[in-house]
Every structure is written in C-alpha cells, then in structure tokens.
C-alpha cells in the first residue's frame, strides 16, 4: 500500500489532465488497502473519484482497465447501470462519483447481507455470457490457496524479521488444514467446477446502498474482475459479512461467524445465482471457510515478510488480522453441519 502524500498542486495537475479544472475540494476517500483514492468536488457540485493505481500490486494497469471497460460495457448493453470509466492517465484514473448512495465497512443487519449477496449474484449472472476473448488474469493465482501456502512457506523459511517463533500456534492451525486447501483449485482443474467471471473482492463496502431503501445501487471496485470461481466470491462474502467484529479486532472473544447472516447471504445469492452447478452448490458452505483461511494465510505471510503488502497501523497489525481470520475459520467449522444444511434447504426451495 502506498503511504505517499500528494501536494494540492500535484493533484490539481493530474485533474487538469482529465479536463477537470474548476476544483473546490480534493480529499482522501474510503478505507481501501491498495490504491490512493480521492474525492473531488468541482464548482458545479459534480463529484468524482480520482485514484492512483498501485502498480506494485497491479503491474498490468492497461489489462485491468481493459477488463473494467469490457465488463461495464457488457452490463450497459444488457440494460444495467455501471460506473462510467471517464479515462485514465498512467497510472491515474477518474470515475464519476455515485451520489445518493453509501457504502458501509461493517455490515449492520441480515437484510444488508441478503441485498449484498444478491447484488453480487446479479453481477456474476449478467457477465455469464460475456463474449470472448477471456478476460485478463490481473492477479494470477489470487485466491489459489495452494499457492498461498507455498508463499507462506517461503516467508517462513526466510523469516526476515525473526517473527516465525512468535506464530507457531497460527502455523500449526494452518498446517492442520493443508489437505483441504486444494479442493476448489483441483475441482476447477478437472472441470468439475467451471471458470466464471468473478469480482474477487466481495466485501460489503463494494456494494453501494441506497440510504433510504437500503437496496443495492451498484457493485464497485472492479480492479480484480477476472476469471475465477464463483465460490471465491461467495466465500469472501461469508468471510466479511458474517463476521461479528472488525477484521483487526484484538479481542478474539468478539470474533465469530453469525449464522443468521450466513443464511441471509445464501438466500440472497441463490435467488439469482441460477448458473451454479451441483459441484458449486456442494462446496458453497466450504468456500467461506477456505477463503477465510486463505486471507489468514495472506496476513500471516505479510507479517513474516515484514509487512510489505497490506497497510499496517502498528507492528503486529497483520498478526492480529491473521488471528481474527483463523478464529473465524474455527467458528465456521464449529457450525459446519448447520451451514451446509442451510445451503441444501435453500437450494431445494429455489
């Protein structure tokens, strides 16, 4: 994550390159980990989102913007609405700001879980017939848990900060679950689970909500749209939307997966995810555990590597995040039978 600061003169110069000159305010915006994001207001009362693409994370900025352009054009061609990509100048881009909508970082009720899951299901469903060619794979092996384990092993072996001795409990927890890490990857390789176009960052704050009706207005943050498994998207919804506490909650007694939110996600998602095959449905509950484990692995890897990827606020921030994810995995495992029953019963009723 970039921690650099920008002078007002720099930002105004960048905005001028997009033809935006009558600016009254530019301020940092949002809570994202990766890109530098600013909200821009002009004298007419029109607002924009100005964003610097972090090319350390997204080296193929051209390929990413090509994906976004193709996806948004396809959505519009089917009568949907999308963010308009106004342009970008290496590596900056400018979007129209969606008014009369809001995002939330922590889900507030089960109804929001239903609406968010339904919004992502509609997003996937709309893109199911996107014409060839295949979208660019912006972040290869992004949700590949087997590969994430390999990177963890490399970070543990290097132990550049001498932190390995502090995380033996976390390593033991992860190692005990290695056998199931390849379930989705292997099923995709065999063709049992199909490749689909997926969002790959399905947090609640990537669905904009109408502040009055609470209905989903738009799916945003399309940087990671690329080929993948629908299970990755659903699994990340389970990870983020069923969590009773923040991603970096230190008190693990507050961290657990909420069954009523899981049930709302399943009902909202399956309402429009008619494209899922039997193998995908069978792995739907499992996907939440797997993606949560995968993110925990990523946080631990970054901690061992010296905190080079995720922005941190204090020395052990990534370790705290890892522990939160692993506690969520344990909570989902404790409720495994009930979660799988919810999926079966909901699928039968649809």
Task: Mark where each language-model region is.
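Juxta-kinase regulatory segment immediately upstream of eukaryotic protein kinase catalytic domains
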Residues: 1-27
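Short secondary-structure junctions
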Residues: 16-23, 77-81, 273-274
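Catalytic activation segment of kinase domains across protein kinase-like and atypical kinase folds
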Residues: 191, 205-246
């Amino acid at each position: 994550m970039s921690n650099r600061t920008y002078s007002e003169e720099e930002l105004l110069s960048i905005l001028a390159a997009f033809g935006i000159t009558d600016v009254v305010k530019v301020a940092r915006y949002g809570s994202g980990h990766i890109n530098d994001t600013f909200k821009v207001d002009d004298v007419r009362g029109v607002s924009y989102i100005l964003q610097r693409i972090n090319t350390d994370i997204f080296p193929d900025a051209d390929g990413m913007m090509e994906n976004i352009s193709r996806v948004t054009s396809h959505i519009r061609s089917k009568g949907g609405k999308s963010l308009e990509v106004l342009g970008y100048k290496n590596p900056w881009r400018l979007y129209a700001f969606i008014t009369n909508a809001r995002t939330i970082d922590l889900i507030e009720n089960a109804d929001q879980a239903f609406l968010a899951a339904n919004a992502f299901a509609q997003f996937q469903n709309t893109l199911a017939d996107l014409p060839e060619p295949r979208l660019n794979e912006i972040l290869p092996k992004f949700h590949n848990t087997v590969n994430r384990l390999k990177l963890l092993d490399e970070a543990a072996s290097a132990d550049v900060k001498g932190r390995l001795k502090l995380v033996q409990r976390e390593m033991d927890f992860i190692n005990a679950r290695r056998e199931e890490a390849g379930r989705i990857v292997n099923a995709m390789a065999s063709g049992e689970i199909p490749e689909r176009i997926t969002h790959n960052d399905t947090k609640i704050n990537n669905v904009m909500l109408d502040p009055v009706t609470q209905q989903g207005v738009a799916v945003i943050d399309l940087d990671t749209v690329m080929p993948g498994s629908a299970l990755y998207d659903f699994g990340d919804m389970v990870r983020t939307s069923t969590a009773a506490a923040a991603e970096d909650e230190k008190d693990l007694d507050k961290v657990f997966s909420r069954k009523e939110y899981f049930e709302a996600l399943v009902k909202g998602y399956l309402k429009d995810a008619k494209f899922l095959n039997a193998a995908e449905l069978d792995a739907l509950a499992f996907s939440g555990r797997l993606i949560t484990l995968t993110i925990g692995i990523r946080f631990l890897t970054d901690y061992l590597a010296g905190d080079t990827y995720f922005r941190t606020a204090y020395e052990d921030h990534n370790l705290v995040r890892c522990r939160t994810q692993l506690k969520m995995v344990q909570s989902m495992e404790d409720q495994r039978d009930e979660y799988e029953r919810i999926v079966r019963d909901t699928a039968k009723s649809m």
